[in-house]
Amino acid sequence: SSIQHCCIAGEPLNPEVFKQWEQLTGLKLYEGFGQSESSVLIANFSPWITPKPGSTGKPSPLYDIDLINSEGKPCEDGEEGEIVVRLKGHDWPTGLFTGYYLDDEMTKANLGGEWYNTKDVAWRDSNGYFWFVGRNDDVIKCSGYRIGPFEVESALTEHPSVVECAVMILAAGQHMEIYSSDNLK
């Protein structure tokens, strides 16, 4: 009764969890995205943004965030790309780490260019909301499509017979394996 706002971070939640949470508590979940190397980069910042279940929200005003494709070019709305933080052209982004401990080579490789690449894949809708797909190294290519475990899990949990599921990438990204629990309601 005293909780007024609920924020989540880490791995994204499936849309079905958002629905169930709101039905049980009457409260919306405000999702965010960040890394150990940074503070919150993208979020459903309450009360300025109406959360869209499953979306990680919009970029923090502290950061110049974009999505870049495999050719290093900015993505169009609806196109998947890697989440990047602009490093050049202004002061160092507040809350972003400044290097890897005792590893100048890795620091230069990741922080020496125009962008810091989070290695996380997302897409942006026409309203500026970002939708997390997965880690770049946690996505498989199937029939020309890039598929992340989260997308498959989200689709499966919409089915009434699935309470929970987990999708894992096996054999060096060659296939996915699915584990689920039956409807226990």
Language-model features and meaning:
Residues 1-51, 64:
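Gly/Ser/Thr-rich phosphate-binding loop
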Residues 55-62, 116:
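Short coil-to-beta-strand transition motifs
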Residues 19, 54, 105, 154:
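Active-site phosphate/pyrophosphate- and oxyanion-stabilizing loops and adjacent acidic/basic residues
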Residues 7-9, 68-70, 86, 102, ...:
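Thr-Gly-centered strand-to-loop micro-motif
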Residues 69-71, 80, 112, 126-127, ...:
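Residue-level recognition of short loop/turn positions
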Residues 106, 119-185:
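AMP-binding/adenylate-forming catalytic core of the ANL superfamily
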Residues 59-62, 73-109, 147:
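Conserved ATP/PPi-binding loop(s) of AMP-dependent carboxylate-activating enzymes
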Residues 10, 34, 57, 120, ...:
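Active-site glycine-centered loops adjacent to acidic/histidine catalytic or metal-binding residues
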